[in-house]
């Protein structure tokens, strides 16, 4: 069914048709640039636009309106530089001392 159509279009047209019809390569078809864009095939015959219809694009989904006044994570707004300072002070008495090699640490 598609073989005679592919043979008439030449190599570039065949690739273009394969990319447009293949389900896996549907996203790549628009990015591939082909030399058969001029309207004529490799043999010099005029290109018949009725045989290939351009793929129909689905209607764009309307974007959800952006509203940052209804932020759900209310705890996030309470964070400051000193938020966990009291927790660190409470837990510091439970920390184990770290072993040292006996020499000073390098100054970075």
Swiss-Prot record:
Please state where this protein is localized: Mitochondrion inner membrane
Give coiled-coil spans as residue ranges: none
Q: Does the keyword Glycosyltransferase apply?
A: no
- Membrane is among the record's keywords: yes
Any GO BP annotation: mitochondrial ATP synthesis coupled electron transport
> What cellular component terms from Gene Ontology apply here?
mitochondrial inner membrane; respiratory chain complex I
Q: What topology does it adopt in the membrane?
A: Peripheral membrane protein
Q: Which residues constitute the organelle targeting sequence?
A: 1-34
Alphabetized InterPro entries for the sequence:
NDUFV3
What superkingdom heads the lineage? Eukaryota
Q: Which of the residues bear the PTM Phosphoserine?
A: 105
Keyword line: Electron transport, Membrane, Mitochondrion, Mitochondrion inner membrane, Phosphoprotein, Respiratory chain, Transit peptide, Transport
Chain intervals for the UniProt region annotation (Disordered): 33-72
Q: Family per UniProt?
A: Belongs to the complex I NDUFV3 subunit family.
* Record's function text: Accessory subunit of the mitochondrial membrane respiratory chain NADH dehydrogenase (Complex I), that is believed not to be involved in catalysis. Complex I functions in the transfer of electrons from NADH to the respiratory chain. The immediate electron acceptor for the enzyme is believed to be ubiquinone. May be the terminally assembled subunit of Complex I.
Q: How does the record describe its quaternary structure?
A: Complex I is composed of 45 different subunits. This is a component of the flavoprotein-sulfur (FP) fragment of the enzyme.
Q: Which PANTHER family match?
A: NADH DEHYDROGENASE [UBIQUINONE] FLAVOPROTEIN 3, MITOCHONDRIAL, NADH-UBIQUINONE OXIDOREDUCTASE
Q: What is this protein called?
A: NADH dehydrogenase [ubiquinone] flavoprotein 3, mitochondrial
Q: Which organism is it from?
A: Pongo pygmaeus
Q: What is the gene called?
A: NDUFV3
């Amino acid at each position: 069914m598609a073989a005679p159509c592919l043979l008439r279009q030449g190599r570039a047209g065949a690739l273009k048709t394969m990319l447009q019809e293949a389900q896996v390569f549907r996203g790549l078809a628009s990015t591939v640039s082909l030399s058969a864009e001029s309207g004529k095939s490799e043999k010099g015959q005029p290109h018949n636009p009725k045989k290939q219809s351009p793929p129909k694009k689905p209607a764009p989904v309307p974007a959800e309106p952006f509203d940052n006044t209804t932020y759900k994570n209310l705890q996030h707004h309470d964070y400051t530089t000193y938020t966990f300072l009291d927790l660190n002070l409470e837990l510091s008495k439970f920390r184990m001392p770290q072993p040292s090699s006996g020499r000073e640490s390098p100054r970075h």
